[in-house]
Regions:
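Compositionally biased terminal segments of proteins
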Residues: 1-151
Length: 151
């Protein structure tokens, strides 16, 4: 998935962390909407906010810069880059939040129906992937035994 950050005319010191709908799309869970959400370091946020002072947002302490199609946050529910970037997947010019941390963010917002649906999609993917690995490691005799047991 290619995301062109050049419109920002900004050099990040750490790769921005892709979250939200585009991260859902990256994992093949659903298509994203028009906006592209990132979390960045406090250092990068301070510099980006200085560059776009008229594009700042504050959602209950979560500070963001909303410019072009990007919503770029210092934190989400006060969880910062260092917390959310653990086990992120490196891409060209940015990172993608781990599936487990994406699940965590969706759980925090699950009172909103859209995010509850996302939560279900992520849980289903995690379980499907885990059981696929388990199944592939079984011998054909073990697979046959399970198939007979469940028919």
């Amino acid at each position: 998935m290619s995301i062109d950050l050049s419109r920002l005319n900004f050099s990040f010191t750490s790769p921005p962390l892709l979250i939200g709908g585009k991260a859902m799309e990256f994992y093949g869970l659903r298509l994203a909407g028009a906006d592209i959400d990132f979390v960045i370091t406090a250092q990068d946020y301070a510099r980006l906010a200085a560059q776009y002072p008229d594009k700042l947002r504050d959602l209950w302490g979560d500070l963001g810069v909303c410019v072009f199609e990007f919503e770029i946050w210092k934190s989400i529910c006060l969880f910062d880059y260092d917390f959310l970037a653990k086990n992120a997947l490196d891409q060209d010019g940015y990172s993608v939040i781990s599936l487990e941390n994406l699940l965590f963010l969706k759980a925090l917002a699950m009172k909103i129906e859209k995010y509850h649906v996302d939560l279900t999609l992520i849980v289903d993917k995690i379980l499907k992937d885990k059981y696929a690995i388990w199944w592939d490691n079984l011998s054909s005799a073990e697979q046959e035994r399970y198939q007979k047991q469940n028919n």
